[in-house]
């Protein structure tokens, strides 16, 4: 049994290498180069020691301490990520504080989409730029190669990654091993580079170079891209495999490679043009470019899958309209493909690649998205530590202030890059934030209008008993979001058809602030009268609502509904924009557009289409 557990843990650790660490694992391709090039710093030993020390201790403080030691503790029943953290943070807060937490979480999620666009662009471009090291004449092929790889990657998404995903872990294990070996080879030739392990070199560099050193932090943070993935992917692998992979292979591989690049620059300052690929001997350049391209594809796949997962969570939590979701694996519920998100990402990535043309230009855009998300995570972590865990204020404030100062320094160092490309994730973030907040606000107003117009359910049932209508055989299930009002579809059915079914079931599907709902808490069945029942089905934000599955569970609870004798009634609302206060006109137009393009409720809740009756209803916004 113990051997089996060890094998399972080893398998999860290997799998985590392929998914969690792809992004941060490809950072050595461009980070050290950008630290020097962005500020035109000379490659002197003091500068090399200072920048290496900043990179190394940033990895220790931000990744090892903040994320691995602390943030991974803030799991929402095993799940991580900005949406899970937001749901956890708002769970125990007051109504006034809840909306502020939601706004923070939504903007953090919006910045992640910017990251999902920039990561494939910058990582694949940086791998393709290795061709320039092979021969200066190959420069013209860099952009076409990057575009070809990216188009191929997005075209393959619809087929799923279940099979090729099995190779991700072993490939990244080889990648980190080679990172370490290449770096160690140079360190042996220039052991003096290990002086940079002393944090005093980082302090000296910052004090001697002043404002220029501060701005260099904007490039140092590139070494931390992908740190958020440690937390976001916790639900797939668990804390222990993620921690083991980090300390056993990822951190040593990254550390050795960065120090190896520094050692190379000490012996050959001209190698700054591409210190990563120049670590490799000439005969290994082409295989190294191929491996780097594969590693960047894996890193890109991780953020693309993350974008699908985040969108699905946003839909279930009510911050995004329903979109088409395809399952690409019979075994893993998390393996999904979302056509709209896929093609939107592809178009955005290609526009970014063809606009910026090289990884150095894109590096400026990268930092804002990464540091913004890191800072928001720190803020939400404070709320969880203080409110959920009830940490004493000095402890919660002390730890989060330490992280906050580091995050703020990195973010501030990137602000000056707004004109050079930093505007890209900010514009993307604001656009996506506007869409998500508009959808949430619009749905809240819509539900409020429906509640105001709805008849009280108890009075309605009492009147039906006093003046019974004609009855027809079978069961009618009315899907409704309101608990105490009469569904519009029920009123319209009674008004136009003048009949009711023998059994009337009012079914509400609710998404909770937790990833998974225990099976014994899934259903709540209440008989309201001789012919009326209420069924409440609860799902977590990582689960998939399924109405047929709810019927099966009802049968197990003793409340049977034969599918072929059951009709499902839904309201199909036509939303009309009005001058009512509460929502700006331009937001109303956006909301109407999103509503028209949302996936039908019958498809989203997997209601059998041949058993559905839709009744129109007009609602004023």
From Swiss-Prot:
UniProt subcellular location:
Cell inner membrane
Reaction(s) catalysed by this chain, per the record, are: K(+)(in) + H(+)(in) = K(+)(out) + H(+)(out)
UniProt record similarity statement: Belongs to the HAK/KUP transporter (TC 2.A.72) family.
PANTHER family assigned to the protein according to its UniProt record, in alphabetical order: LOW AFFINITY POTASSIUM TRANSPORT SYSTEM PROTEIN KUP (PTHR30540:SF79), OSMOTIC STRESS POTASSIUM TRANSPORTER (PTHR30540)
Q: Where are the transmembrane segments?
A: 9-29, 48-68, 101-121, 136-156, 164-184, 210-230, 246-266, 275-295, 336-356, 364-384, 393-413, 418-438
Major site of localization recorded for this protein = membrane
Q: Which cysteines are joined by disulfide bonds?
A: none
Q: Which GO terms describe its cellular component?
A: plasma membrane
- HAMAP family of this UniProt entry? Kup
* Molecular-function annotations in GO: potassium ion transmembrane transporter activity; symporter activity
**Primary role:** Transport of potassium into the cell. Likely operates as a K(+):H(+) symporter.
Q: Which domain of life is it from?
A: Bacteria
Query: Pfam families attached here?
Result: K_trans, K_trans_C
Name under which the protein is recorded:
Probable potassium transport system protein Kup 2
User: Which UniProt keyword terms apply here?
Assistant: Cell inner membrane, Cell membrane, Ion transport, Membrane, Potassium, Potassium transport, Symport, Transmembrane, Transmembrane helix, Transport
């Amino acid at each position: 049994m113990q051997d089996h557990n060890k094998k399972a843990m080893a398998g999860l650790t290997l799998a985590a290498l392929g998914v969690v660490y792809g992004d941060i694992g490809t950072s050595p391709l461009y980070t050290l180069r950008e630290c020097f090039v962005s500020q035109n710093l000379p490659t002197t030993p003091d500068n090399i020691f200072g920048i290496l020390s900043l990179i190394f201790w940033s990895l220790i403080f931000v990744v090892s301490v903040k994320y691995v030691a602390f943030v991974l503790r803030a799991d929402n029943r095993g799940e991580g990520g900005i949406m899970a953290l937001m749901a956890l943070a708002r769970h125990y807060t007051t109504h006034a504080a809840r909306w502020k937490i939601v706004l923070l979480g939504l903007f953090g999620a919006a910045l992640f989409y910017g990251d999902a666009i920039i990561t494939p662009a910058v990582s694949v471009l940086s791998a393709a730029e290795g061709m320039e090291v092979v021969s200066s004449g190959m420069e013209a092929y860099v952009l076409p190669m990057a575009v070809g790889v990216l188009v191929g990657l997005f075209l393959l998404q619809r087929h799923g990654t279940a099979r090729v995903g099995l190779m991700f872990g072993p490939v990244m294990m080889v990648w980190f091993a080679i990172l370490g070996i290449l770096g160690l080879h140079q360190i042996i030739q220039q052991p003096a580079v290990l002086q940079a392990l002393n944090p005093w070199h980082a302090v000296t560099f910052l004090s001697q170079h002043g404002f220029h050193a501060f701005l260099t932090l904007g490039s140092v943070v590139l070494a931390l891209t992908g740190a958020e993935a440690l937390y976001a992917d916790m639900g797939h692998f668990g804390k222990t495999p993620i921690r083991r992979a980090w300390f056993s292979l990822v951190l040593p591989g990254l550390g050795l490679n960065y120090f190896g690049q520094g050692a190379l620059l000490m012996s050959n300052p001209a190698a700054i043009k591409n210190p990563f690929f120049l670590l490799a001997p000439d005969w290994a350049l082409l295989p190294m470019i191929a491996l780097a391209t594969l590693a960047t594809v894996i890193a890109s796949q991780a953020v693309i899958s993350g974008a699908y997962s985040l969108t699905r969570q946003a839909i279930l939590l009510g911050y995004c309209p329903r979109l088409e979701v395809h399952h690409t694996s019979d075994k893993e519920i998390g393996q999904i493909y979302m056509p709209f998100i896929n093609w939107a990402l592809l178009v955005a990535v290609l526009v970014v690649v063809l606009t910026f043309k090289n990884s150095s230009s894109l590096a400026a855009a990268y930092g804002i998205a990464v540091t913004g998300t890191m800072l928001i995570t720190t803020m939400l972590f404070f709320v969880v530590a203080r409110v959920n865990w009830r940490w004493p204020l000095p402890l919660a404030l002390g730890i989060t202030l330490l992280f906050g100062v580091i995050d703020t320094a990195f973010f501030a160092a990137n602000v000056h890059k707004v004109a050079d490309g930093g505007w890209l994730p900010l514009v993307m973030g604001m656009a996506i934030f506007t869409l998500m907040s508009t959808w949430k606000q619009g749905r809240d107003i819509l539900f409020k209008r429906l509640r105001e117009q709805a008849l009280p359910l108890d009075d309605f049932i009492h009147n039906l008993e006093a003046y019974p209508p004609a009855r027809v055989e079978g069961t009618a299930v009315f899907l409704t979001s309101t608990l105490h009002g009469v569904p519009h579809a029920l009123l319209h059915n009674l008004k136009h058809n003048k009949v009711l079914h023998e059994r009337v079931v009012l079914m509400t599907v609710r998404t909770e602030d937790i990833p998974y709902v225990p099976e014994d808490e899934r259903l709540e069945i209440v008989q309201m009268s001789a012919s009326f029942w209420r069924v409440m089905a609860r799902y977590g934000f990582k689960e998939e609502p399924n109405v047929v599955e709810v019927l099966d569970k009802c049968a197990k609870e003793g409340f049977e509904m034969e599918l072929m004798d059951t009709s499902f009634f839904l309201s199909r609302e036509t939303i009309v924009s009005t001058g009512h206060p509460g929502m700006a006109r331009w937001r109303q137009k956006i909301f109407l557009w999103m509503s028209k393009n949302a996936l039908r409720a019958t498809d989203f809740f997997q209601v059998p289409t041949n058993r559905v009756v839709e009744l129109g209803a007009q609602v004023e916004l």
